[in-house]
Amino acid sequence: MSRRRQNKPRVITPDPTYDSRLVHMFVNRIMKDGKKSVAYRLFYEAINEIREKTQQDPIKVIEQAVRNATPLVEVKARRVGGSTYQVPLEVSPERGTALAMRWILIACRNRPGRTMVAKLTNEFIDASNNTGSAIKKRDEVHRMAEANQAFAKFRF
């Protein structure tokens, strides 16, 4: 860790179509090899499918999915006296959102299916309904933190 100064957080501009920072963050995480236009196309098609399937505002569905998948606590490895403990720590809102987005995208990439659009759509709908792989991952992290609650005294 640098001792000089903390780096400034990046300013994320809102998405031009939906005026949402969350959409822009998702597009940046979907993007591979710098192909942002492809990532935008995938995400916008997924948004249209969400609108057709749920008859709701797709941005609200996506926000609900991220809110549901956001962890409250996580565990970090900490060496104390030659042994490593999994120490539970609270998650900051920014990190929680980043983890939720990462887990949703990992879950949709691991999903069986033909197109990324269909997988992304189904994962968003599942996460907004508190089901799916991203929610399982959040619950698993919460269980780990609860199981290691005795080591909370070793906080950083």
Swiss-Prot record:
Keyword presence, Transmembrane helix: no
A biological process from GO: translation
PROSITE patterns noted in UniProt: RIBOSOMAL_S7
InterPro entries with a match to the protein in the record: Ribosomal_uS7, Ribosomal_uS7_bac/org-type, Ribosomal_uS7_CS, Ribosomal_uS7_dom, Ribosomal_uS7_dom_sf
Localization in the cell: Plastid, Chloroplast
Keywords (A to Z) from UniProt: Chloroplast, Plastid, Ribonucleoprotein, Ribosomal protein, RNA-binding, rRNA-binding
Membrane-spanning residues: none
Pfam families: Ribosomal_S7 (PF00177)
Signal peptide range: none
One cellular component term from this protein's GO annotations in UniProt: chloroplast
GO molecular function terms attached to this record: rRNA binding; structural constituent of ribosome
Top-rank taxon: Eukaryota
Subunit organization: Part of the 30S ribosomal subunit.
NCBIfam families in UniProt: rpsG_bact (TIGR01029)
HAMAP family in the cross-refs: Ribosomal_uS7_B
Function: One of the primary rRNA binding proteins, it binds directly to 16S rRNA where it nucleates assembly of the head domain of the 30S subunit.
Family: Belongs to the universal ribosomal protein uS7 family.
Protein name as catalogued: Small ribosomal subunit protein uS7c
Organism for this UniProt entry: Oltmannsiellopsis viridis (Marine flagellate)
Phylogenetic placement of the source organism: Eukaryota, Viridiplantae, Chlorophyta, Ulvophyceae, Oltmannsiellopsidales
